[in-house]
Design a protein with these regions (language model features):
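N-terminal cap/lid subdomain of alpha/beta-hydrolase-fold enzymes
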Residues: 57-119, 307
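Conserved acidic catalytic loop of the alpha/beta-hydrolase fold
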Residues: 131-151
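Conserved hydrolase catalytic core segment
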Residues: 150-188
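Alpha/beta-hydrolase-fold enzymes
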Residues: 173-257
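Active-site nucleophile elbow and catalytic-triad environment of alpha/beta-hydrolase enzymes
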Residues: 266-282
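Short beta-strand/loop motif that positions the catalytic acidic residue
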Residues: 286, 292-294
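Conserved alpha/beta-hydrolase "acid-adjacent" motif
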Residues: 299-306
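Catalytic active-site module of serine/aspartate enzymes centered on a nucleophile-bearing elbow/loop
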Residues: 318-355
Length: 355
């Protein structure tokens, strides 16, 4: 009986620990959802949309220092509310404690519940770029929320590139910038070639029908899985989970069999939006303190090219934190796990103006 009681007590203790861990990852206020209509929105092409819908979420009180968080390609504001990201950042005592910050999570133009081709315009939707996406975000922040200055702009992957653009295009709008898994330079090398192949694979699929399909092209899922494996995940991590051909086939088959509820036109527009990205010419205009966070095994932004070291010299108050590669990191996806960099963020914010 004593042994049984000890086992039950241990099990109960373990359950309490699991409950505590789950609670600590979710101890921030419930996100509030809202929509903003940007009227007469002008795209870089000169096209004007009478009403552009921007969906967003906020956490915390508007009177607190504001933090703008920008998601990656094919993501949304909701995609940033994972245990590995929000659960490491927004809770009590964490770097972006939602009791002390006003956190803004927009769905970028073309993504989530914001205006996008699949709403009905299909390929007649303006061919937007990152500049348009940042312009929409700026109108959301200043017009819908009435904010003139942000404590922090932090973005991951596509959101990281947009963070660079925020610093260049709106240099007085924030105290601090944290672009992650992103470089300020134009698309080039393998990063662009893989994106081009992804886009062309769908556009050249007869099932796409120039964007007028009635069911999603078969190439959509294959192209997404191909691009994901080629440019994300980390070599060490893949080798760990797929050390044999049999296990590699199993992993690939599982990914190809998994549901992919995306729209081909939305998908194409989102990836194509990076085509003319280039924040590099304006780096000297950045006034905010900047912490660039990349991973040593990032397939899209390989550190061995030396791009970041060269470009950061042009930014007044900038430094980089490079996450060491390991079996735990996930290549380009590493920065989605805040455990690898949250202490760096905390120290950075303490040293930044207003910290």
């Amino acid at each position: 009986m004593t042994i049984i009681r000890l086992v039950l007590r241990a099990a109960a203790s373990a359950a309490l620990v699991l409950v505590a861990l789950a609670a600590s990852a979710a101890e921030y206020p419930e996100p509030k959802q809202a929509e903003f209509t940007a009227r007469d929105f002008r795209f870089h092409t000169g096209e004007v949309m009478p009403e552009l819908r921007l969906h967003y979420m906020t956490i915390g009180e508007r009177t607190a220092p504001a933090v703008l968080i920008l998601h990656g390609t094919t993501g949304s504001g909701k995609s940033m509310l994972t245990t590995s990201f929000a659960g490491e950042l927004f809770g009590p005592g964490q770097p972006l404690d939602a009791r002390k910050h006003f956190i803004i999570l927009p769905d970028s133009l073309g993504a989530g519940n914001s205006s996008k081709p699949s709403d009905g315009m299909r390929t007649k939707f303006p061919r937007y770029n990152y500049d348009d996406m940042v312009a929409a975000q700026y109108r959301l922040v200043t017009e819908a929320l009435g904010l003139r200055r942000l404590r922090l702009v932090l973005g991951n992957s596509m959101g990281g590139m947009q963070t660079w653009l925020w610093g260049v295009q709106h240099p007085q709008a924030m105290d601090a910038l944290v672009p992650m898994a992103a470089q300020p330079t134009e698309m080039s090398g393998r990063n662009w070639m893989m994106r081009r192949m992804l886009i062309d694979a769908i556009r050249n699929d007869p099932d796409w029908k120039d964007g007028n399909y009635t069911s999603q092209p078969r190439s959509l899922k294959v192209a997404n899985v191909f691009f994901g494996i080629a440019t994300n995940g980390g070599s060490q991590a893949y080798q760990k989970v797929a050390p044999t051909r049999e296990l590699a086939d199993k992993l690939l088959d599982e990914r190809l069999a998994a549901p992919f509820p995306a729209d081909a036109n939305d998908f194409l527009y989102q990836w194509d939006a990076s085509r003319d990205y280039n924040a590099a010419p304006g780096l000297e205009r950045i006034e905010a303190r900047l912490l660039a966070i990349n991973s040593a095994d990032d397939e899209r932004n390989p550190p061995e090219l030396g791009v970041m070291e060269r470009e950061l010299k042009r930014v007044k108050n900038a430094r980089m934190y490079l996450i060491p590669a390991s079996e735990e990191t996930r290549g380009h996806g590493t920065t989605a796990m805040a455990k690898f960099w949250k202490r760096e963020l905390e120290e950075f914010l303490q040293a930044a103006p207003g910290g």
